[in-house]
Amino acid sequence: MSCIRSLVAVSFLASIGVSTAVTAQEMISDTTARKQPLTTWGVQIEEFEYRYSDDDEELGVWNADAFYGTDELKLRWISKGEYSLKERAYESLENQLVGQIPISEFFDAKAGVRFDTPEGPDRTYAVLGVAGLAPQWFEVDANLYVSNEGETSAELDAEYELLLTNYWILSATLDATVAFSEDREIGIGKGLVSTGTGLRLRYDLIDRAFSPYVGVVHERKYGDSADFARAEGGGTEDWFAVIGARIVF
C-alpha cells in the first residue's frame, strides 16, 4: 500500500511539473509573439482638390501617401501632381518610393528615389530627408534631392492644424523649394525657386476618414525660375480658390 501511495504521489507531482512546464512555455511563446513588431498599412490622401485661379486657370491636384511596415521600418509611396483641366496636361507629376526609420521620439529619417514625369523632360532623384513633429506641433517634412543630371535641391513642407471644435479644423501649409544648381531644361534657377502657402478649413464628416474642405492657395516663383517661366509665356504668381477633401483609409 505504501508503494502504491508513493507511485501515485510521484505521478501527481510529475503531472504538475509537466503542466507547469507547458504553461510556462505557452506564456513564453505568447510573450515572444506579442514582442514581434506589429505590421500596419494605410493610405492618406491629404489633398484631393479642384483649384480655380485668379486668371481662370483650373487644376486638379492631389497629394497622397501610402505606407506598409512596422514602427521600426516603413515603406512609403508618395504621389503628388497638378493636372491642367484646360490644357489636358500634367503641370507636375511626382512619385517617391522611400524607406523610413525612427531616429528620435518625434522624427523619422527616410531615403529612397523620386520620379518626376510631367509633360516636359523627366527627372529621377535620390532622396534623403526627415519627417516628424516639431515643437509647437508643426508637422515638418524636409528633403534633399540629387537628380540624375547632377543637380541638387532641397524642399521644406510644414503644416499646422488648429482645432476649432471637435469637427472643424483650420489647416495652414507652407512649402518652399531651393535649388543649389541650375536646371534650365525644366525651368529651375539657382536659389529660391518657389513657395506655396495654403489655408484650408475642413469638417471631419465620417469618423475623420472623409473630411471635405474649402480654402485658398498662393503660389509664387522667384529669381531665375521666375525669369524662365516668363520667357515661356507663363505666370510667376497665382492665387487659387480651393475645394476638395481629405481621405484616410
Where in this protein do the model-derived segments appear?
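Outer-membrane beta-barrel initiation region
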Residues: 22-86, 100-101
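Residues that define the transmembrane beta-barrel architecture of outer-membrane proteins
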Residues: 39, 58-62, 91-95, 122-126, ...
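Transmembrane beta-barrel strands of outer-membrane/channel proteins
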Residues: 45-47, 77-81, 111-115, 142-146, ...
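Outer-membrane beta-barrel translocator domains and adjoining extracellular loop/strand segments
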Residues: 56-57, 88-93, 122-127, 154-157, ...
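Residue-level signature of outer-membrane beta-barrel architecture
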Residues: 68-70, 99-101, 115, 132, ...
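Repeated loop/turn-to-beta-strand initiation elements of outer-membrane beta-barrel proteins
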Residues: 71-77, 105-109, 136-140, 165-170, ...
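Detector for outer-membrane/organellar transmembrane beta-barrel domains
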Residues: 122-183
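Outer-membrane beta-barrel "beta-signal"
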Residues: 199-205, 235-249
